[in-house]
Amino acid sequence: MTRSAEIAFSASENRFTSEAVEYRVEAWGDTPIGQLFASIRTKLRRRNAGRVRLSDPEIGELVWLVDNVVHHDYPAGTLRAFKRTLGKLRSAPRVWPKASPRAG
């Protein structure tokens, strides 16, 4: 898999971008990971790439994906921020935050 100019998770915005999710869906096709990202992409489109609800299994799949697949594609700091956010989501309401909970 080649590196993309887009990243699937923006630490500064604390969310997925629909374009990056689209890239990952294309990269993984009809595999379980591809289906997961297709589901997330659909949810992002319904909400205009704002907030997206993730189930515990989806969060678990994303943690697996970071640990086993994309760790070589992205900077370590981005992945650490990503995993911290996923850890918080496991114990919080299942909403992918558009911005920091303290913002605004």
Which functions belong to the PLM regions below?
Residues M1-G104:
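Positively charged, low-complexity terminal tracts
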